[in-house]
């Protein structure tokens, strides 16, 4: 079947893009230091700016690329993202000052959007009854890349130097573009200008707002813990190999994602995406309790695993709900807004977590994030018509 073939092709491309994006993350502060920033406070400031820059421009540009994709096709937007990031990332290997790196990270965010376009393309060709498992499996490509990318990035940096890693990453993005160009086939459809779906435009996007809010809160919850999790690990673990244990605490959620995404994706196909989303969101919230109560490393690891398991199930459900509720002529636009919501969570989550930890203590972050997720679960609960046949389709 065409949708299954495309799924595996996009899985490989997603893996390449996400692995490449994460290859440079472990040594970004060291690279900035290599560019001449040596004072600790300045290094921390520049590292924060350079790391966050890509999320800012990605957040701003995703809906625009989605709108263009709805008019001109998703494949060309996949190529735009892969080739754009290929050129920009390669240029990062030649910078001589931190402001140049910052500018290129901002530009890289402008060109990003490969993952959301891949999801949009896959959603558009997959039968609705298989959407959960297909989008859940597609998500695992990105998860695998985000897990392996930092590991190989650190190894490569030691072996060939910082600058060559950027060149290698540009090569990965170029390979992804070749995969898309030669192996992904998108049918060109004649634009429907007579249906209510084609005319309503933005009015048909408004009912999907609860999904966008849930996407934002999903990443807000995950990212709020990231700035403090290694510090928190040190407060409850006093044995040897602290760095290894802290790395395991961070990575275990990703491994759980690999299990949760396809498993709960299939569950959503059986019992409905709204029910699955409610289960996953409620259980994700409760998974913060063992983390907050942990006095030993085993309980913390268990809580982190449960969190990754159920958060992994939230994203496929959210993606399927977007597919069901968005009119076909605005599907990529809707996924663009959904991706912007995820990036906004990436931006605000770490800021919220670090400020709450500084003001009220490390454990408070877990309780605050749990409360936010539970409130969002209530929000989804009261939106009882979420995922039902939309007005544009009924007409």
List where the protein language model places each region.
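Central cavity-lining transmembrane alpha-helices of secondary-active solute carriers
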Residues: 49-65, 251-263
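Juxtamembrane intracellular "pre-TM" segments in multi-pass secondary transporters
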Residues: 1-3, 185-213, 395
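Helix-loop junctions on the cytosolic side of multi-pass membrane transporters
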Residues: 180-193, 381-393
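Cytoplasmic helix-loop-helix junction between adjacent transmembrane helices
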Residues: 104-142, 320-321
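Short amphipathic helix-loop junctions that connect adjacent transmembrane helices
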Residues: 27-44, 228-244
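Structural signature of the two symmetry-related core transmembrane helices
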Residues: 76-91, 170, 275-290, 370
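Paired small-residue
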Residues: 88, 99-107, 287, 298-306
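Conserved MFS/SLC helix-loop-helix module at the cytosolic interface between two early adjacent transmembrane helices
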Residues: 59-96, 268-274
